Amino acid sequence: MSDALVRRLREQIAERDRAILDAVNARLKLVAELKRHKETQGIDFVDTEQEERLLQGLETTNPGPLSREGLRRLWTEILALTKREVND
């Protein structure tokens, strides 16, 4: 692999990494807003049935190459991270 190709691919990966970071931060803001609203309504913040529906929906629309197991592991961690972040 040429140095120019390595550089170009690394730049593209870095762009995707920044996009992922932006998306996670945007998701955290939305979840924090949802949590505040649920608290005012007396609704439990965590909804395990909704989390499972989310995972199933993502599995259905995942074009790959991320495996089903990989998707579940990734989103389980994102959900856990989200709960930790909005509860701090």
What is each of the regions a protein language model found here?
Residues 1-88:
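Domain-level signature for soluble enzymes in the chorismate/prephenate branch of the shikimate pathway
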